């Protein structure tokens, strides 16, 4: 692991992709047959705001060099994804054990019994795992508990009382390209060069 992406490098644009390789064929009768051959992971295309080497890009260049192309992993917290749309603010935990492959997860510890404790599209992680999951249905709690539907299916088992992280979500990722280019897009009136950087990362499983 080679650290956390510099917080001073603010995003200008963000593209989110979900990768899930699927083989599809059809029977003689025309019925679709499908199977998935590897695990889902997220991918991002990110463009960093224009800035000078002295205030953003010096630190950013050094960080990217430390990654040694795709060799190292690092954490990144995309601003549009790191916090939930829901209203939950309490410590939420897994209720009971769950096995790999589950998509419905029992949780308890919700702060109140109302709708939209979590919202569809919110991201969560579980203690002991780095994989990020997306909640795919709005969550209403009852008796401070609820069943949450996630995608992709769990990669590994969950223990009872494992804590759920739903704010300040960190994705563990790696660069996907061997060549990383910092482009000069202009200069200030004082002659300082202005850089811009666009890069792709993929979630590391």
Where are these regions (language model features)?
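Extracellular/virion structural assembly segments
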Residues: 1-205
